[in-house]
Amino acid sequence: MREKGINVKLAFLKAVLFAVAFAVIPANAFTLDAQGGIANRVSSISQFNMSFYGHWWFPIDKMTFVGVGGGYEELDNVGYVPLSASLWVRLPIGRQVLPVAIGDFGYMIGERHQMFWRAGGGLDIKNGDYSSILLMAGYQYLHHEDRGFVYLHAGILVEI
């Protein structure tokens, strides 16, 4: 009987948290991006590794976003699923083509799981009011491997 009471309380708590979460989120809070490309080791730039990444962003304003990221990367024939906390800043230069800076810090799950960080930048090419084409490049560092990778990505950003 006690277990049933705990389950009811947990269900009520979940419902309240769900309602509060969607009550305070602005209408344009569902901003997503998806990117794909390559990530090459800095020491051997000619060896290509596939890299796919995406983010769910929460807009602070039109120029700054915080969010969570994840994806799939294959680095030196080892598959990883990176999960990260992320920051995106559009620089106030231009109207249709905006330079951006991005940073991620997180954990790579895989055979050689480890912490990682990435820093990069690129271009946010406005497609319309709610979408953009992304061209991104940057540096990614793996903690246990003690080496860096250069990544090049292209993708799309959708602000709903």
Region roles according to the model:
Residues 49-51, 80-84, 149-153:
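Short hydrophobic/aromatic beta-strand or adjacent loop that forms the aromatic wall/cage
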